[in-house]
Amino acid sequence: MSKVFATFGARFARLTLCTIGFALICWCQAPQMRTRYLTSLTNTEIEEYLKRNDVIFIPVGNVEVHGGFPTDCEYVGPLAFAQKMAEEADGLVLPNLAYFFPGGTVVGKGTIYITPSEGLPYLKAIARSLLRQGFRRQIYLTDHGPSPQTLSPLVREFFDETKDPILYIEMGSLMRKAHADFNKVLFGAYSVVGRLDDIPLNVTQVMQEHPSDPGLNKLQALGPGSGAIGAYFGDPGEHGGLAKPITAEQRAQFAKEGVAMIDATLKVADVKGIVQAMRDHDKFTQDVILPKYGNILPK
């Protein structure tokens, strides 16, 4: 009889461990969804999501000349990161925010020019709407040097007005930590969002002889990207490199390597840790800072 109980006890212990292990796996994995794109979900699906979480990733881009890539490549890059981040952290993605400040690339006729002061109110209106809808954890993503001129005022002013600490991540800094090749990441990004064929194979770009600005490099190094001094590129070919023909096989290989670099960047980023840090920071603000200093803080 004791052997029977011993056998039963061992089996019960194994079953219990398996159950606990399965529960931990489920807890660590984000729930499956039909899509993470808010614009592809029904209102019912969005409201069901908001019952369990409040995280949304907002890729913000620009449309500009960029060598052999489509002009929206610096929107597609953050979009791919947002999609993967949302899958990892159980968030949603708000797409289609592609038209913001490009910087000095306005010399290319494919560049759409919106100033930071024009883009900021639009983003702030979206942020307010998202907060009212229930998205308190808003994470804005860019991969474009001049973007901080629009996004940094957004997160600072929105926090002062609402006391909701939304976050801005410039993906370039994270990619550098992961030693990622920026061009290959773009190939990978188009693959992630299902648009790899949008990168052309047989485009050749020629840059005409033109003078270079003798003082620009010294001056631009004195401040943040495009924020130290106003300037324009001397030729569209100076931004993104010159387009060169590639084969379909090369494009597929670059995309494969780029996706791996995106994944490596996300590992460095620790997306779940970022979201938890936002919750901790928000709680500290609400529980400690506001009760102590609320009467003198900006309204």
Task: Please give the residue ranges for each predicted region.
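Extended, histidine- and acidic-residue-enriched regions that form the cofactor-binding/catalytic faces
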Residues: 29-91, 95-104, 108-114, 121-139, ...
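N-terminal secretory signal peptides that target proteins for export/translocation
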Residues: 1-11
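Bacterial N-terminal signal peptides
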Residues: 13-26
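Sequence-pattern detector for short linear motifs
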Residues: 6, 14-17, 254
